[in-house]
């Protein structure tokens, strides 16, 4: 979700440097699983951008982050940090930053290995199709969803943990109501069941 300083309501998205290494880490079970094996195989030079796949994330503007701590932002978003978690913040893209709940052990391992080379990001910050009016649905697994609505700019972004098909259809229908116009729906998912479900009710473009 994107929080705007004007409304403080949940609404809701970095340019890569040269020699930047990008890695994607899926933190299953709500962000509490981390495999350290990949860390030892990463090159010793260049920035490290780690994408954290977890629904325990939200978007804010730089202004909001200057007024509230990352921990407070997650708490207000209904994502109180567990004792085993820390809050991390991404670099900014178009004045938007991701605030993410991350397992402490994973965080400490990454910081110890990469220190100032380390940058975090979230799929919520993806800019795919940001140049058009579109609704984008991405999945990390069968229950972790990233929903982004572009309607004359980023209007809404959600990182969600959905337990059922009905929940997914509820959110999709509500976001399309927010759009209040016909827009293309793009889906990026390896979950064939999800694709079949959405195709049953909507015209979707698979990527």
Language-model segments: which ranges?
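Hydrophobic/aromatic-enriched cytosolic interaction surfaces used to assemble or bind macromolecules
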Residues: 1-207
């Amino acid at each position: 979700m994107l929080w705007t300083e004007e409304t403080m309501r949940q609404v809701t998205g970095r340019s890569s440097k040269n020699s930047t290494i990008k890695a994607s880490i899926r933190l299953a079970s709500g962000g509490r699983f981390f495999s350290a094996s990949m860390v030892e195989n990463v090159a010793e030079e260049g920035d490290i951008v780690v994408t954290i796949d977890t629904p325990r994330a939200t978007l804010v503007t730089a202004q909001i982050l200057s007024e509230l701590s990352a921990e407070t932002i997650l708490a207000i978003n209904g994502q109180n940090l567990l004792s085993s978690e820390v809050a991390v913040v991404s670099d900014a893209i178009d004045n938007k930053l991701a605030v993410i709940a991350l397992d402490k052990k994973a965080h400490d391992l990454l910081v110890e290995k990469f220190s100032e080379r380390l940058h975090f990001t979230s799929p919520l910050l993806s800019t795919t199709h940001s140049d058009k009016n579109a609704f984008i649905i991405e999945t990390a697994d069968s229950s972790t969803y990233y929903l982004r609505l572009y309607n004359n700019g980023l209007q809404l972004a959600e990182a969600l943990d959905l337990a059922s098909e009905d929940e997914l259809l509820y959110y999709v229908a509500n976001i399309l109501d927010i759009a209040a116009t016909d827009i293309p729906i793009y889906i990026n998912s390896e979950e064939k069941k999800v694709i079949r479900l959405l195709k049953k009710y909507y015209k979707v473009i698979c990527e």
